[in-house]
């Protein structure tokens, strides 16, 4: 997840510096998109781990 830190930091920095441009809706949409992306990322990791466990248990 380290590769996600820099874009998020840049987005937050841009939002803070350009506070006149960044209103409540921008923050809401940004947080929603980041939350959706992180939840999808975690779901993919969990499904991969479960497939790995299924393979090891089926081998015997």
From Swiss-Prot:
It is found in: Host membrane. Coiled coil: none annotated. It is a single-pass membrane protein. The chain crosses the membrane at residues 28-48. One of its GO terms (cellular component) is membrane. Keywords: Host membrane, Membrane, Transmembrane, Transmembrane helix. This is Protein P7.
């Amino acid at each position: 997840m380290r590769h996600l830190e820099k874009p998020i930091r840049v987005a937050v920095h841009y939002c803070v510096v350009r506070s006149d441009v960044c209103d409540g809706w921008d923050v809401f949409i940004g947080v929603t998109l980041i939350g959706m992306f992180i939840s999808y990322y975690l779901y993919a990791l969990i499904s991969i781990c479960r497939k790995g466990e299924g393979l090891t248990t089926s081998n015997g």
